[in-house]
Amino acid sequence: MTMITDSLAVVLQRRDWENPGVTQLNRLAAHPPFASWRNSEEARTDRPSQQLRSLNGEWRFAWFPAPEAVPESWLECDLPEADTVVVPSNWQMHGYDAPIYTNVTYPITVNPPFVPTENPTGCYSLTFNVDESWLQEGQTRIIFDGVNSAFHLWCNGRWVGYGQDSRLPSEFDLSAFLRAGENRLAVMVLRWSDGSYLEDQDMWRMSGIFRDVSLLHKPTTQISDFHVATRFNDDFSRAVLEAEVQMCGELRDYLRVTVSLWQGETQVASGTAPFGGEIIDERGSYADRVTLRLNVENPKLWSAEIPNLYRAVVELHTADGTLIEAEACDVGFREVRIENGLLLLNGKPLLIRGVNRHEHHPLHGQVMDEQTMVQDILLMKQNNFNAVRCSHYPNHPLWYTLCDRYGLYVVDEANIETHGMVPMNRLTDDPRWLPAMSERVTRMVQRDRNHPSVIIWSLGNESGHGANHDALYRWIKSVDPSRPVQYEGGGADTTATDIICPMYARVDEDQPFPAVPKWSIKKWLSLPGETRPLILCEYAHAMGNSLGGFAKYWQAFRQYPRLQGGFVWDWVDQSLIKYDENGNPWSAYGGDFGDTPNDRQFCMNGLVFADRTPHPALTEAKHQQQFFQFRLSGQTIEVTSEYLFRHSDNELLHWMVALDGKPLASGEVPLDVAPQGKQLIELPELPQPESAGQLWLTVRVVQPNATAWSEAGHISAWQQWRLAENLSVTLPSASHIIPQLTTSETDFCIELGNKRWQFNRQSGLLSQMWIGDEKQLLTPLRDQFTRAPLDNDIGVSEATRIDPNAWVERWKAAGHYQAEAALLQCSADTLADAVLITTAHAWQHQGKTLFISRKTYRIDGSGQMAITVDVEVASDTPHPARIGLTCQLAQVAERVNWLGLGPQENYPDRLTAACFDRWDLPLSDMYTPYVFPSENGLRCGTRELNYGSHQWRGDFQFNISRYSQQQLMETSHRHLLHAEEGTWLNIDGFHMGIGGDDSWSPSVSAEFQLSAGRYHYQLVWCQK
């Protein structure tokens, strides 16, 4: 044990937090989570241990701007200014100091290992009592599961130790410091340490004791570590559970270890042995260790699909059977290996349906509770995810247990990121930083290696490629050869990774960056000598209204076996709740706390909002990742299962044929599909309707029974096909009433019964419509070529750092947002059965014509207004965001009804999950509340739209909202939006894709850009 004078001044004088060679003082060795049961049955059933006591709850807390400002008296008693805070928590969430959101840029001046003198410091204290029996015998430990970023610990005024690495436990022996009666802990937490240079992750920078604190009492002679692994024969019919157990304390000949394996209430195998292992070298064996091997016949294998778990109980006892203590863990029989260029689980090639997940809560910051963790897992499973990457640090220890039990594959990632260094490997190639990096990797492995859900180790994130990575890669491969190692830094295919694991590589497009080229994922596989599998560690940047082009990745994954999926960036928006002057909550992002530097809304890249409400993009991910694929051939549906291990036993296939959303025929068939098998379903003769319309066949896979992760009736997969229709021509009924055209100096006015249309001759716009005396428009109907910029349109562009390549900057520079319409033509003609208005406009900016729009409005005797639009786009202007029409309707109706793709928001490059049907939703549901306002709520493939007294028919895309595109564009946060008068309608003949391969470079695929020079669309607008 390192002995240091207890005084605060002496401890601070050492400045351990600025010495990369000091990552801990007196911290105990890493190991799997312990409970020290004194009853093996309680260990088997995972009951709460009487030897494990939580110290979570109210602690006393005082904040200081620097550690030197803390008075020496704090070691002995609470300070007058101390407040009460809940542990675990981040002190920034209690109003102390400010959270800082930055992605790459370090929040402190870069001068490793030194940190600012102004180093916010939190002083925690807690008084507690210890059982008398704990003082009389054994060892009492204190466990801090997570403290950011470094801390010193005192107990009863005596210095105990020091720890850093905010995402792994720091555990200390308190036995020599405790006393009978009341005891007092004092924990000094520093916001910045040299460890902060290794924790430059894209997240909020927060501080404090943010994970659980507990006391653990272990006997003097104790289990100090245990590791379980599973081995198999070739066909997985026989297995061996290999358990290595290590003890500490007084080694006696009468000590024994028993390892028993349980499946529920049934003991499957058991073995007992004294300590003393196999001979290691010429000096002998480890006297304090023993390895037991238990044979298991026909083990039930673990996978994310079927997470079969056993329970291993490790008992330390005497030769006569007297139990000293027991530890236990869940065991999953599974094998991970790479063979022939494929990542295999239990001999089957995996397809990773993965997502990156930060530990984030809108109210609690980086504090995770079981309820939130389970909520995340259930949502992931319900949306066809089977894997999660712990980005970018080891997670709360409970997370892994839950992933074991519910079934998720885990990439466990070391808490190492040096993204802001120049070059990025400045520290990771420096041997002085090897001890700090080594602690972060080795302790992660020692804590988590018993979890079957952990199938891949990661050396960290965005830290370049240095010699330290190579050393740690070799250490892991030596200690745990049962798992592959991945690491993206330095080019995604270095010698420090078993898997090519690029981030944001595109399907077909190379990005030849200097030194670290990012090839297309297809090309990467074909590079000379490259035989590794490729799994994208990050892809499909889900920032705001995004995930366009997601289907293209999944087409490639299914086409090329060595493209084994990837991890979407990322799971949850990292917004935080703030309150306005009236106490109303609102969602905040970078800069909203006065934090500098900051990266604005770049912290919000989630498939779900911070409160776990899904983004519309989540449905697209669910659909593309679904485990059943469908093919229609004539009257036969071929259903293919992509499950590797699970036989469909809880699935019904519902099918329905509908004409324009009206059901004509339906049925259901139980699915009985073997893993990776097929089932052919013969449909009856399908009806052929006589009336015109779109005929669609829809299939949905429904789970009739609830599961551990879903309710009864859960829909897991679906597909639609448009069927051939009989040609049916419906002639419009002739009307003997002809609308009346009145011409004045300023207007053309058309009147039919109680309806009127007014066209302004100076502007050439439809300026007003009346039904009776009620005006229908608040603004004229006009062309629209822009949208409120998406995050993907903006990229990294901001006022102080313009990116001229960003879509929004190109549109601004070309004048798309400032363009004004010059009238070229406005004429009216009375036809035999209608009135025809013809207009033409040149949309210009600074004398340059960007678009020419020609329209005809044909108003007939039935009151229908048929609009045709022809647009010419200048060859030298950027491709526009949309080609459509917009106006502000006077009405505010409660509901929106449409025949088209839905029900969720969809865009041209993100619509495979949408279904063609007749949908009816509240107006409020047509708006997607992205925290950073932008274009939202589009519905594509629309044939009919009904809103209030209006109906539109044609082939178009629309969104309808209380917010104008102008307001969305000018507003920084969703809570600042205000409902405008009436309703804004945007009807597009064409709309550009949204992109999403990444959010910092233009990523809309060429096929979804509006690159043609001419466009034509038409629609009919009528009043009900």
From Swiss-Prot:
Q: Where does substrate bind?
A: 103, 202, 462, 538-541, 605, 1000
Q: Which InterPro entries match?
A: B-gal_small/dom_5, Bact_Beta-galactosidase, Beta-gal/glucu_dom_sf, Gal_mutarotase_sf_dom, Galactose-bd-like_sf, GH-type_carb-bd, Glyco_hydro_2, Glyco_hydro_2_AS
- Please give a single GO biological process term from the UniProt record: lactose catabolic process
Q: Where do the annotations place Mg(2+) 1 binding? A: 417, 419, 462
Q: What is its EC number?
A: 3.2.1.23
The record describes how the cofactor is bound as: Binds 2 magnesium ions per monomer. Binds 1 sodium ion per monomer.
Which terms are listed as keywords in the entry? Glycosidase, Hydrolase, Magnesium, Metal-binding, Sodium
Q: Name one Pfam family in it.
A: Glyco_hydro_2_C
| Binding-site positions, Mg(2+) 2 | 598
Residues reported to bind Na(+)? 202, 602, 605
What are the required cofactors? Answer: Mg(2+); Na(+)
User: Where are the membrane-spanning stretches?
Assistant: none
Per its UniProt record, what Gene3D superfamilies does this chain match?
2.70.98.10, Galactose-binding domain-like (2.60.120.260), Glycosidases (3.20.20.80), Immunoglobulins (2.60.40.10)
**Family note:** Belongs to the glycosyl hydrolase 2 family.
Quaternary organization: Homotetramer.
NCBIfam families assigned:
PRK09525.1 (NF007074)
| Stored PANTHER family | BETA-GALACTOSIDASE
Protein name (Swiss-Prot/TrEMBL) = Beta-galactosidase
